[in-house]
Design a protein with these regions (language model features):
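Conserved short strand/loop->alpha-helix "switch" segment adjacent to the catalytic nucleotide/phosphoryl-transfer site
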Residues: 33-55
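Conserved polar catalytic motif of the HATPase_c/GHKL fold
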Residues: 56-60, 64
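A short, flexible helix-to-loop-to-beta junction within the catalytic ATP-binding CA
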Residues: 65-70
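A conserved short beta-strand within the histidine kinase catalytic ATPase domain
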Residues: 71-81
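Glycine-rich/acidic phosphate-handling loop/turn and adjacent ATP-lid/helix
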Residues: 87-112
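Glycine-rich nucleotide-binding loop
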Residues: 98, 131-138, 144
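ATP phosphate-binding glycine-rich loop and adjacent ATP-lid/helix-beta elements
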Residues: 103-128, 132-133
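C-terminal end segment of the histidine kinase catalytic
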Residues: 143-150
Length: 150
């Protein structure tokens, strides 16, 4: 069985599917960054925000989605660019089981801040958790006040 991730890309869309592991998460992150550079031609600052927040969603798949499974699962990254609306949407999904973390003190150094990071970096963050899996959708406007955005 081939464990290498699969990729489909065009100027408006990117789809990547692979094992929910750290190596694949890194490869999906690199593919997303290249796609953003080539297809969207956005500023480095906006790209960095997108890649950082999507990396957090990928890391959550790796760390949490299949924790109670005996087999390694998969994750999917789907990105789209709407030039008319000047927006980018990226969804990361898995078929695992998401468990809301127990509340922790805000100053607890072990507290996860990933969801807050995604919410801060994206213009809109939606997390849909179902028994059949979890999908995180992150939406960004490319018409930010960043003067280097093309």
């Amino acid at each position: 069985m081939d464990d290498s991730p699969s990729f489909v890309a065009d100027p408006a869309r990117l789809t990547c599917v692979g094992a929910a592991d750290a190596i694949t998460a890194a490869e999906l992150r690199r593919r997303l960054d290249r796609w953003l550079q080539q297809a969207v031609h956005g500023s480095a600052g906006v790209r960095d925000d997108i890649v950082l927040s999507v990396n957090e969603a990928l890391a959550n798949c790796v760390e949490h989605a299949y924790r109670s499974h005996h087999r390694r699962g998969t994750m999917r990254l789907q990105a789209s660019f709407d030039s008319a609306a000047q927006s980018i949407s990226v969804c990361v999904s898995d078929r695992g089981r998401w468990h809301r973390p127990a509340p922790q003190r805000p100053n607890d150094p072990r507290a996860s801040r990933g969801i807050r990071l995604m919410q801060a970096l994206a213009d809109h963050c939606t997390i849909n958790a179902h028994p059949s899996g979890t999908t995180v959708c992150l939406d960004y406007t490319t018409a930010r006040s960043d003067p280097t955005w093309n």
